[in-house]
Amino acid sequence: DRLQGRAMSGVKEPGKAADPIIVHPDVRRMLLTQKAFVEGGRVLCFLTGREIDSAHLNPDPQARQASNDLIAFLTPIVKGFLTEAAMEVTSLAVQVHGGHGFIRQTGVEQLMRDARITPIYEGTNGVQALDLLGRKVFGTGGKSQQMIAARIVDSIKKFGGMPEIAPLAADLGKRLEQWGRLTAELGLAAKGNPDEVGAAAVDYLRVVGH
């Protein structure tokens, strides 16, 4: 609701001294980035929670094992990627508020400080990233990646025909191919130098999380 400046595309609130900051493109960019991370993160958590229920309650032993395999793959992503996303989201929240975001008046700075500890406890994100790339991807011979990739392909086939979804589905398909190439390249590099896994793990986790 804060009034500050005028919209580049023209005055939006002529009866007021200035326009709300939400009309400014950069503010909208930051808000939409936060929205994407928060809503996407919730869906990822819901998906993981559903698989946990399936692993405990599904009467089919094969289905329970499939859920356990998926949980093992998703856990370092949920912990590692979403905690880094929390830092970015809260940092953007401070930025949206400007100087008032940095002081205690709004409470936003407390959210940012609270988020900062999350990449550290319960296994640092570096450890989570090593778990993902070293154990869940390379350690399974790529089976875990193939499992999640197959699910993504099924979703693309299922929803790709919807006009409003088609561009996103096509882009997701490209990202899936890039992920496969990235993993293959890292696998070759790691054979020559195992330290490549540790050096690339955190960035790899971020790529997979996105």
Annotate the PLM regions.
Residues 1-210:
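Flavin-dependent oxidoreductase catalytic core characteristic
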